[in-house]
Amino acid sequence: MPSRRRHSYTVGSPATTSSNYSNTTFTDRSFPTTPARTSTDTTTSIARRISGIFINCFTPPDSVSSNYIDNSKSSSDNNIRSRRSSTGSSSVQRSYGNANETEHTRFTFDEIYDATKNFSPSFRIGQGGFGTVYKVKLRDGKTFAVKRAKKSMHDDRQGADAEFMSEIQTLAQVTHLSLVKYYGFVVHNDEKILVVEYVANGTLRDHLDCKEGKTLDMATRLDIATDVAHAITYLHMYTQPPIIHRDIKSSNILLTENYRAKVADFGFARLAPDTDSGATHVSTQVKGTAGYLDPEYLTTYQLTEKSDVYSFGVLLVELLTGRRPIELSRGQKERITIRWAIKKFTSGDTISVLDPKLEQNSANNLALEKVLEMAFQCLAPHRRSRPSMKKCSEILWGIRKDYRELLNTSL
């Protein structure tokens, strides 16, 4: 029988909506980095109460029919104009082997246009806030994913250009096994296209919905969680300056044929402040996806690496329950997944939140409790109470090790 040990946690109130906008994406207007009041990060236990208030953090305009809302008014970026190409192509470096075996090539708009047969829906593999993603096989036989920016975004050209260049600049400086690889970009008239690694097995959300026809077992889910944690840790600790992804969610996690995770979509990424400057956060209007947004960021406009930690906590709950962060089709008590999960957890009924597609056994039940415990620490309302992504990676590594050992002994 599973343990019915009672727990008590406080979690931050998620961004919710009162209408059908569960995938709504916020956009931002940037402000200069400003120092915050000094506060000492101490290791604290999660407060001994459950937050009873879940704030409706935004109300989408009635006139918006898309799931993505663009209110960006960023200042113009001279870099964008200087990087436009009259031929509609950009010179990039592509590596197909090891670091010493690189090929230099040039993407052109015509090549991509022909390969997708005028961006035919038959080549479409995804849709997001940035635009549409297509699978492309070019003349050299290599397969890529190309992200074509929405034309509607160009009504606010400065904001669209800034977001496009943000993703390019971020992708160009990161290299990690669990991050989608960047190959280049194309600008041709009003067309803006990113060329990135093609990851063959769809999104994590597709697999949790069983759209791919196979249920992810607990071992695979722990691998995915660990991969994502390592990728975010790399962004926070091993890039200079650190990078805040700002849109960690299941539809931005791609799976390889071996079910290893790759974090994608850096359109909302921001550079964290240089610690030498004395700044502790970036002041910026909100950008992200409803249900995953850090409530402290929502109320203070102060973005830090701990905002990614909060989103990661939501992702962990999603991995374990199989549910989306916001499920408007459910009753009021179950509509917000993290609120429902923590109530079950604190009442000692943890096993009831396990994805019904997973078997209830001793190994799965233990992993469920341990990962949920860490997830709720990530969901603490105040960033100082959340663990770092490095700490999350270490904890997940240990949970996965214990899970494998318990699974092997029970066979």
UniProtKB/Swiss-Prot annotation:
What Gene Ontology molecular-function terms does this entry list?
A: ATP binding; protein serine kinase activity; protein serine/threonine kinase activity
Biased composition range(s): Low complexity:
16-44, 66-95
Q: Report the superkingdom from the record.
A: Eukaryota
Where it sits in the cell: the answer is: Cytoplasm
Residues with the modification Phosphothreonine, per the entry, are T108, T284, T289
Disulfide bridges in this chain: none
UniProt keywords, alphabetically: ATP-binding, Cytoplasm, Kinase, Nucleotide-binding, Phosphoprotein, Serine/threonine-protein kinase, Transferase
Q: What is this protein called?
A: Calmodulin-binding receptor-like cytoplasmic kinase 2
Encoding gene, per UniProt annotation:
CRCK2
